[in-house]
Amino acid sequence: MSPYLATLFTFIIAVAFLRLMDYIAQRGWIDSRTSRKLIHIGTGPIFVLCWLMYPDVWISRWLAALVPLLITVQFALVGLGIVRDEAAVKAMSRTGDRREILRGPLFYGIMFVVITLVFWKESLIGIPALMMLCGGDGIADIVGRRVRSPKLSWSPEKSVAGSLSVFFGGWLMTIFVFAIYVWAGAFSGPVTGYFLPVTWVALGATIIESLSFKDIDNLTVPLASILIGYLVF
């Protein structure tokens, strides 16, 4: 497939998912916090699996990075009040304050752009970092709020259930994506060979997420995953 056509398909799929979440939140079918986390969880695997449509040419990663870049620019414009988009504000903010988009969601988009350009599908390091951000950190808030469990002594805002969900959510999502990449021939198999290194990445990301880095865990979790990835892959 042409890299330009792959980019068009990726952009359409990503925007359709975001608009679906905006619509659901605006209709009141789910609260804004849940919508925000569903966007957090779902965007990553959708985007990374779209990489498989791209041919192995140098321009592919740059064109692919345009998708999160354009969406991140939109986040910034909405957060700054330059563009009015009440549906997006409701879906991506905790309290309805557009300025919240300039923190977590903006950092989220920036990490996607950087990791796409630096690692792309040529490296095993980038995908676990993104999946720990999505499947780990994203699921933690939902599980932590719904499952009653003891709080962490070193971080009272975090819970045991939330931290366990970071580990297992990120691990499972990473292995799921790796399995598809192995099946598609993009990564060498078997997928079981990735279990141990992904476990180390998930453990490190879980420890970092358990610390109280308010509003910047969208940076700290993938960065920690990248550092560990360099050691284990």
What is the predicted function of each stretch?
Residues 1-5, 19-63, 76-176, 180-231:
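Interhelical loop and helix-boundary elements at the membrane-water interface
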Residues 14-17:
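Glycine/aspartate-rich loop-and-adjacent alpha/beta segment that forms the canonical ThDP
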Residues 66-75:
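Selected alpha-helical membrane-embedding segments in polytopic membrane proteins
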